[in-house]
Amino acid sequence: MRKTLIVSIIFLFLLTSCTQQDVVKNQPKELLYVWLHDIGFEDPNFLAVINADSESENYGELVDTIPVFETVGMAHHTPIFLPSSGLIYANDFHNSHTYIYETSDPLKPKLSKSFGKIKEYSFPHSYSELPNGNIISTFQTKGGINTVGGLVEFTSEGKYLRSADAEILEEPVFLRPYGIVLVPKLNRIITTNYDMHETENSYHIQIWDMKTLEKLHTIRLPKTKDKIIDQNPFEGRLLSDGETVLFQTFSCGLYMLNSLDQNMPKISYVHHFAEGPFCSLPVRLDNFWIQTVASDKGGFNGVVVLDITDPANPTEVDRLDTGEDYGTHWLSPNK
């Protein structure tokens, strides 16, 4: 997350539903897991459990907190969706650390495992569950802050399985693996590139073979006349056809990626959300794209909704202005 964003506390969340056997009188039917740090980065990161059952008497109240052991941390990313194993991967970006929480008792999660660098890969960012239940993760660097990281695959419990470097040896391309989009129908993984340390801008996405982790393509985003919106490909989402991906840049451009099973996949610029602000994590709900937008320079703060029935020609259908004091950063679907 950029230091310039108005939002000062990073919090990432996942919604989960309790199973029928867990639900007893006075216990919530839905919970919100929040991964966060204190505003001064002095105390340990912790997972908070919040009552998210709107019909409960204690709706919105804190149920429990489960801290980690390290301090001066930066609670950052978790998976967008709760993995089928019920294990939550959560990173502390500053400390280059991963924590795994076990949620078999939804009201009382437990910290089951943690680890730092893996095979020299450091600064983990995103996690996503593969169709076989394993977890794939982006690591921004390998061996030092000025190096290129890659992909690392784990079992659901966090055992290292294999890895693949993102670096392009043939030419100098600035890469820092960031977001993940899975395309199981076409056996593809898409990774975006944004440097959390903000040493340089990135302009490329990468395409991988899901079964082998072979790096297939490294593609630069097309430039757009009179607009600087091709910087830092940030987050992507798979569309309902199971083949097309939309992804936005931190500089608020929206791009379509298709022909993923062809020799030359195609990237097309399709929309510009706003001038100046930063565009962060979106949600796709059916044929709607819901985009967070934040600005520290007096620009638009809020959420923009696009109709993406025709992804090559999205249409804005609504926007919510959250005011100058609140810049949105993260959205997560309730699944």
Predicted regions and their residues:
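Beta-propeller domains
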Residues: 180-304
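Asp-box/WD-like beta-propeller blade repeats and closely related beta-sheet repeat scaffolds
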Residues: 106-184, 193-195
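Blade-loop segments of beta-propeller domains
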Residues: 59-129
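Beta-propeller fold detector
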Residues: 58-68, 110-117, 161-168, 215-222, ...
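Beta-rich, blade/repeat-based domains predominating
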Residues: 69-83, 118-131, 169-187, 223-244, ...
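Short loop/turn segments immediately following beta-strands, especially the blade-tip
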Residues: 49-58, 100-109, 157-159, 207-216, ...
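Short glycine/acidic-enriched loop and turn motifs that connect beta-strands
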Residues: 38-41, 94-97, 141-145, 195-199, ...
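Residue position within the beta-strands of beta-propeller blades
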Residues: 34, 90, 137-138, 191, ...
